[in-house]
Amino acid sequence: MSSSLSLLAHLRPRVRARVRPSTIRCFIISQHLHSDASSVAETFLSRFQSLGPQTRMQTIDANQLQLLTLTLNRPTLFPGAPSLSNGAPAPQSAVPVPPGYHLAYFTPAFMESELGSDGTDASYNPDVPFTRRMWAGGEVLWPRLNGKPNPLRVGQDVLETTRVLSAQSKVVKKTGEDMIVVGVEKEFANEHGVSIIDRRNWVFRKALPVPSASTPSSAPPSSSTSHIATPNPTSSVISTEGNTYTRTLMQTPVTLFRFSALTFNPHKIHYSLPWARDVEGHKDIVVHGPLNLISILDLWRDTRQNFVDSTLVIPERITYRATSPLYAGEEYRIVLEEGESTKVEIIRPGGVVAMKAEIQ
């Protein structure tokens, strides 16, 4: 390092006065941190790929499907189907699972002592300090069988196969913070073959310190002061303009709590305001990424109710990416635009895009 500085001084004498030792140390530390992120990512990928695919078998339960439908504030599973509310029976055997609703199955099964400090399950976490997980996006495919979809159905025994596809170290553009992006693939197969291929991208950032009780919060005040129930999205007006469909929604703390419970998701940002605000820096509890994905798919199939069999309105593929958090109590719009492919945006107050998706 000293010889390099001597050469620099010889070639450009004026520069020497501006090169501080602290600057050099910061550069070395920065390089070391980025190297650590790369090393953690490589170790993680090597460990999980050496383990090979992980498999689980589960029966598609009617009760779980009923509760998810009601959590989404939809009284029926499909247009013209019997009501599922107020003591009504659960869907019958062989009823198809709507697109996206598979997310209520194969939920993580861990004791509380095995969870991370933020409540997330650590089943696919890189090593410390990269343990703060966020659902960044992904894609879901519904393969065709003889030209037709092969949906999961109530009562079927389904095999889930999970593979770790990738782990890459990256840098947050706005802050320069290191992070690791992990790609995971989940394949769901019934007796007829593969029904769903679900590829997810998780971002892992460094865990944040828990502030002391005396530390004031820097987050803006909470917006979830209203506990008015979310309106039934199927009865709400879908405004249309040409090939564009818009639905306005608002998620309440109760809806987020029920969705967390149903999907066995203990991530604290979805139900603990002190954690979301004081530790993570959010202004309120955060709407789940999977809940946003389901809401997009629900709007897509609600615009296709003229199909002969509404139970088989299933896309071939959706790609999606979360771009900004949504909060409880915020009214937001899902805007769907038809074309060669269907493009969807979830738009927060102020015109901020929270999620982008494309459906084929």
How would you describe each model-predicted region?
Residues A17-S22, P89-P99, K173-G176:
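Short, surface-exposed loop and linker segments with low hydrophobicity and enrichment for Pro/Ser/Thr
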